[in-house]
């Protein structure tokens, strides 16, 4: 009977992985730093994605080698950085025939996985860090003070006109701040997940979706690709909802905040396993024991809440309303495609296959 033999991680393996990684990550950081489209998003000199990712890269360069030498993780033996460099080196081999050259252009499966995982970490890691720096971190204290101040005003409203009116007025004044704080929490969790991959956090990437449809449907929802998506599919921000009726506006605002709370709950439940395109392990607790894609369900609800009022209450022609209705349908279909393509990757995992048998609906409990 053959015994399982543990392969030793040598110093050579460690150094090869380490220097391959700092080279690959350095190239990625340089590309992100000089990309004009991304640089246009920088709003603050000392709090921007270049500073944060630069500090992250320097920390990796300084700390990774001694950590690798001490712990010697077996994942080094299947280094994705080494796989990427092997793929790049193969493109520059001399003396190959045309057939061999064409064959070399196609990455091997481990190389394809490594390349897409690198893209996912770089693109979505940048996206989350940039969003936090530009919109949330520096204004967090102001937002919290704003909510406290308006809460005090709401108490005053309630003492004069009744508690119901005070609560309603508080919601009307502060719903967008609550929405921003919720999105900040979601973005922080996602950013942490994208920029870490450790056994300690139980978020090692098993597989990633490498299909063109899966990647395109995912990145089309994020800047800068969102610019093109917005050109093709009409979209309206919630601030543009033309609702003059106070009661209806309060109801819509509450529903929008609840939808965001649903998104946050779904992301927090995933924790360090959260993220697009990747399988980092299966989560089956609430709300994932109700539907398989609760975050996308909440996104669909959010789309409906911020577009249906535009269509019904705005001054649009019949043709304009048809265009808006088509836009709503296309955005919802985009999230449906994201769910389907994600599951195509996740279904390679036997644990997810069992999960699908137990939780049979994607978006709406007992319906769809």
Region roles according to the model:
Residues 2-277, 305-347, 351-368:
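Membrane-anchoring alpha-helices and their flanking helix-loop junctions
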Residues 280-288, 297:
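Alpha-helical membrane-protein architecture signal
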Residues 285, 289-292, 357:
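Short amphipathic alpha-helical coupling elements at transmembrane boundaries
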